[in-house]
Amino acid sequence: EGVSDGVKAKILKIAKELHYERYLRNSKTGYIAVLVPEVFMETKEIFYTSIFKYLYAEAIKKNYYLTLYVVSRWEEQNPAPPSLCRADKVDGVILLGQLALNYVKALRPIALPTVLLDFNYTNLGLSCICTDNIEGMYKATKYLIERGHTKIGFVGNIRLTNSIRDRYLGYYRALIESGIRIDSRFILKERDDANNDIGLALPSEMPTAF
């Protein structure tokens, strides 16, 4: 629930390609740490909690347990590896949802197999599993356009995560290709640049689709 079969299959496929299971065969603890930003564990957020449930179910099949660690906003701004991320406590680390660049950099010296899930920092050279947000949003927007919509809204702050930015690029591309002018009134943010929930300020003239 909340995670498509395609995403699930992609996670398993790439994990095998990255030989994550091979690293874990030599494990000693039987635990994998999953680090997720605090903002993605709020009550109304279901995407990452759904992914975690799926990862947990798959880990159990391999006789591993996942240990969830919620990274607070303060920790992201004052990066240091949590005590959980040590070779005598876990055999690998999954970073679930985009964490601040400096926080991810602070984890590099721990020398444990690490995978970024649903985000990437290309300059760090870490393994990642990402969905194709650009193409996915492009197809979704084209679908609406083909059904006659020209006033299409977008919800998300593109400064917050790579995923939101990539979705916007797919949305933008579909509108441009179809000769539809981007209307700034229909670009809505539900969070500010500090990732605080600010609610949606709806325009006086609403788009016909989102």
Where are each of the predicted segments found?
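Amphipathic helical "hinge" segments at domain boundaries
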Residues: 18-81, 89, 169-172
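Short beta->alpha connector loops
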Residues: 72-76, 95-101
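Short acidic/histidine-rich motifs immediately flanking catalytic phosphotransfer sites
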Residues: 86-92, 204-209
